[in-house]
A protein has these predicted regions:
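Short acidic beta-strand-loop surface patches of small beta-rich interaction domains
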Residues: 2-17
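Short linker/helix segments within small regulatory modules
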Residues: 14, 157-168
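Loop/turn positions that initiate beta-strands
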Residues: 18-25
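Short, Lys/Arg- and Gly-enriched loop/turn segments at beta-strand edges
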Residues: 29-41
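BRCT (BRCA1 C-terminal) domain core and associated BRCT-interaction motifs
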Residues: 76-90, 97-100
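Residues immediately within or flanking Cys/His clusters that coordinate Zn2+
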Residues: 136, 169
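Short cysteine-rich clusters marking metal-coordination/redox-active sites
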Residues: 139-142, 172-175
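Short functional micro-motifs and their immediate structural scaffolds
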Residues: 144-148, 180
Length: 196
């Protein structure tokens, strides 16, 4: 329970009920920001982390490009997905309704769209993630965090054209891949802006 409304007003557990009070009780909200009301939990707004099933590989890449912690491995079966989701407090995104019926699973969402771009917009809307997009935060390949790195430290890994043209670089903490803000970055930025 994260929210109790009595007669339309937010109250805490200590509220004493009166005759005729109308009560509504709500779980943790995923798709709207309820920052300015009386929360019953110490940290109601969450760090949104996902784990995706085998059907959502392209959605995984879009979510990582937007900076969201997104776990995906097409070799995982349903039981492994549920185990990881529960251990790491991840939301399962799936096209498999059967997976969502698992009694051990506490947080999941059935992705309705079939087009990867539309799926991405669906997830942004469903979990109210517009304001949380952070480009150049996660590696689209392995989900590792990207950290700024000085060009001098990676000179030997860059092609001459890249060395001359770009000055801002990032390295993945997971797979050591190097990224820079080239034309692909502008395309990603434009793509993300389409969903606002």
């Amino acid at each position: 329970v994260d929210l109790i409304l009595v007669n339309g007003n937010s109250v805490s557990f200590s509220y004493q009920l009166r005759q005729g009070d109308r009560i509504s009780v709500y779980p943790v909200f995923e798709s709207m920001d309820i920052t300015n009301i009386c929360h019953l939990r110490p940290a109601p707004l969450r760090e949104t982390k996902f784990i995706l099933d085998v059907h959502l590989g392209k959605l995984c890449k879009f979510l990582r490009l937007a900076g969201f912690d997104t776990w995906y491995d097409k070799s995982y079966d349903d039981s492994e997905i549920v185990r990881i989701a529960e251990e790491q407090k991840r939301i399962v995104l799936t096209r498999d309704k059967g997976l969502l019926k698992n009694k051990k699973l506490s947080r999941g969402y059935w992705v309705r769209a079939t087009n990867p771009k539309i799926r991405f917009g669906e997830i942004l809307k469903r979990f109210d993630l517009w304001e949380n997009i952070q480009l150049a935060k996660r590696c689209p390949t392995c989900n590792g965090l990207l950290t700024p790195i000085a060009q001098e430290e990676i000179e030997d890994k860059l092609l001459p054209f890249i060395r001359k043209t770009y000055k801002e670089f990032f390295q993945c903490s997971g797979c050591d891949k190097i990224y820079w803000k080239g034309p692909h970055f502008q395309m990603i930025k434009k793509f993300m802006e389409e969903f606002k």
